[in-house]
């Protein structure tokens, strides 16, 4: 009986050590973008866009990442739906890729891929528009979003 209890405790310990606890974080991404209009009318707006910027985070592991995002927006009346993908490049060359969706000013995101320290990453969270700035150059737009979420990495 003692062996059985000992084996159960050891097994639990081994499985617990294989998975790292989820790390929560907050970050801000500020970026500039360009859009390609597909349809622009009172009834329907459809466009694609590309954003380039930088991520700043309260977690050093996520801080100072370069960002590129592509996405689409569809607006029918007052309803806005957007979706896309972002790639983050860290100072050491590692990357991660996320998928996101949402309404006009916020939504959800999740990790799809990671390399190096991000290999086999899992997690996701929410994004929220915090600021839109007046375009610095005609044909561009600038904004900042807040990201909140968590990630898990295997040990």
Language-model segments: residues:
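Sec-dependent N-terminal signal peptides
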Residues: 4-13
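Beta-strand-enriched cores of mature, soluble protein domains
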Residues: 21-155
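Sec/Tat signal peptide C-region and signal peptidase I cleavage site
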Residues: 15-21
């Amino acid at each position: 009986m003692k062996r059985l209890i000992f084996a159960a405790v050891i097994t639990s310990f081994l499985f617990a050590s294989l998975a790292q606890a989820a790390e929560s974080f907050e970050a801000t991404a500020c970026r500039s973008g360009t859009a390609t209009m597909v349809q622009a009318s009172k009834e329907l707006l459809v466009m694609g866009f590309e954003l380039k910027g930088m991520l700043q985070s309260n977690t050093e592991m996520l801080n100072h990442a370069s960002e590129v995002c592509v996405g689409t927006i569809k607006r029918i009346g007052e309803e806005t739906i957007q979706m896309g993908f972002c790639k983050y490049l860290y100072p050491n060359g590692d990357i991660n890729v996320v998928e996101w969706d949402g309404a006009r000013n916020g939504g959800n995101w999740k990790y799809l891929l990671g390399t190096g320290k991000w290999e086999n990453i899992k997690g996701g969270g929410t994004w929220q528009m915090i600021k839109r700035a007046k375009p610095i150059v005609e044909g561009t737009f600038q904004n900042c979003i807040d990201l909140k979420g968590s990630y898990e990495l295997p040990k």
